[in-house]
Design a protein with these regions (language model features):
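Hydrophobic structural segments
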Residues: 1-120
């Protein structure tokens, strides 16, 4: 039998802040730009460390519908390409700034950004 216990309060953070995990899909050539804007906006901070992020390559597909202005592919076609998923943590004090920075720097017309509230 596996018993689950709540971890100590200071295991993940020293301050009493709500934390989020942000995950964003980006083209291969944009990873450095997005990492930079996230860090400058206050994301990826864990204790005395900044720029704490991970990313991995995935294969993605989509079909651009009429009215779209796709970064890659053409309207009415299904596009398949390699891209990165980048993820990091951000506290509630910086969440709005980080999301705005990603949207401003991201080359996609409709950036895919997932925000998940983490358990404290």
């Amino acid at each position: 039998m596996i018993m689950m216990r709540r971890p100590p309060a200071n295991l993940f953070m020293k301050e009493d802040l709500t934390m989020y995990k942000i995950q964003v899909y980006i083209p291969l050539e944009s990873v450095d730009t997005i990492r930079e804007v996230i860090t400058k906006a206050g994301g990826g901070r864990i204790g005395n460390y900044a720029g704490c992020m991970s990313w991995w390559q995935v294969h993605s597909s989509w079909t651009s519908l009429p009215g779209a202005h796709p970064y890659d592919g053409a309207v009415g076609e299904t596009t398949e390409t390699d891209e990165y998923i980048l993820q990091c943590r951000v506290d509630d004090a910086h969440l709005s700034d980080v999301l705005a920075a990603i949207r401003e720097a991201h080359p996609y017309e409709e950036p895919v950004i997932d925000v998940v509230k983490l358990w404290k």
